[in-house]
Amino acid sequence: MRAYELMVLIDPEVDERTVEPTLKKYLEVVTNAGGTVDNIDVWGRRKTAYEIQKKSEAIYVVVNFQSEPAATQELDRLLNLNETILRTKIIRPEEQKITAE
């Protein structure tokens, strides 16, 4: 299992109350493959740095989860098929190194 961080930009016309339940439906791919969802953090509506699909705002969501690489690829594929999702990015956060001084 590897730790991942997913950032999703969702169409601002979507009701913010439906964002988390909708994402949980997609995150079932991770849990069905034996992974865990650690945190879903809805940042809310924010201005984007540049227009994405002719929209200058988006609803930002950050999800921390642990999964196998195959389940992560399938999650990314399914999210990109949804028309209300403007952009996705999945990264593996770097482990912090503890140094003794």
UniProtKB/Swiss-Prot annotation:
Domain of life per record: Bacteria
Pfam name, any one: Ribosomal_S6
UniProt keyword annotations, A-Z: Ribonucleoprotein, Ribosomal protein, RNA-binding, rRNA-binding
Cross-referenced InterPro entries: Ribosomal_bS6, Ribosomal_bS6_sf, Ribosomal_S6_plastid/chlpt, Transl_elong_EF1B/ribsomal_bS6
Gene3D superfamilies: 3.30.70.60
GO MF annotation list: small ribosomal subunit rRNA binding; structural constituent of ribosome
Gene Ontology CC terms: cytoplasm; ribonucleoprotein complex; ribosome
BP GO annotations: translation
CDD domains: bS6
Keyword Ribonucleoprotein carried by entry: yes
Task performed by this protein: Binds together with bS18 to 16S ribosomal RNA.
Family membership: Belongs to the bacterial ribosomal protein bS6 family.
HAMAP family in UniProt: Ribosomal_bS6
Protein name as catalogued: Small ribosomal subunit protein bS6
Organism: Micrococcus luteus (strain ATCC 4698 / DSM 20030 / JCM 1464 / CCM 169 / CCUG 5858 / IAM 1056 / NBRC 3333 / NCIMB 9278 / NCTC 2665 / VKM Ac-2230) (Micrococcus lysodeikticus)
Gene that specifies this protein: rpsF
